[in-house]
């Protein structure tokens, strides 16, 4: 176990005339409706919505931008809060990323690759992230429900519960 502190530059407000080469939107799914109007009004061209919200098509429609300017990504990590800090597990540091229902344009892929150039962060491109996110949720929700039922101790899961996770 290693303790690290990362300082990532973030903003807490986005004015309509602010411009960024890439805008990474990292909010909880329940917060998205509040930030979408701000993002839509902004003049930046390329947006990457990172998270597990299975509504990529609806977000794309709301943003009213060309499909090749909006990406959806899922960070390959997990974690929990413990004593006021975040304990994270990294499963191959990187992100699965792509368009809502079609592959990203070559220009967008190059822009993303350039942003992570010189890092160990691996990008895996997927052509239909709306599908990918829905499949991920269908796979992970049963595991989450059993986790909650066992108070986080999966060794207490019954045979029936374990079977439901992978059925």
Which ranges hold each PLM region?
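Short, solvent-exposed coil/turn linker segments
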Residues: 10-13, 28, 66, 128, ...
